[in-house]
Amino acid sequence: MNKLTIIFFTILLLTYIIVEKEALKIEDLPEPESYKKAKQLAVKDANGDKRAEGIALDFLRQNRRNCTVNCDLVLTCPLLTPECCPKKNDDCLKLDTVKNG
């Protein structure tokens, strides 16, 4: 019984890894100029503090990812994901998060 359980969860884990690896995500698209400017501002506002810079860039990355399915999440969604907000273009519609979301 334990062997079967381990085999089942191993197969399940491998399937999950393969699906996640093959999924088209927002990070796979080229970064728009407005997002690049937002990243530059985040780095500038950190004033050389690497920890604050990392937090700010992570926050921008998460908002960009979450804005693909919900443009009303934050006011800056059109700047972070112009592919998806306010109108979804072809690049946005190809994303797996948008298809499944």
Swiss-Prot record:
Subcellular location(s) per record: Secreted
UniProt keyword terms in alphabetical order: Calcium channel impairing toxin, Disulfide bond, Ion channel impairing toxin, Secreted, Signal, Toxin, Voltage-gated calcium channel impairing toxin
Signal peptide: 1-23
Tissue: Expressed by the venom gland.
PTM text: Contains 3 disulfide bonds.
GO CC annotations on file: extracellular region
Primary location class: secreted
Domain of life, source organism: Eukaryota
Protein family (similarity comment): Belongs to the scoloptoxin-10 family.
Function: Voltage-gated calcium channel inhibitor.
Protein's UniProt name: Omega-scoloptoxin(10)-Ssd1b
The organism of origin for this protein: Scolopendra dehaani
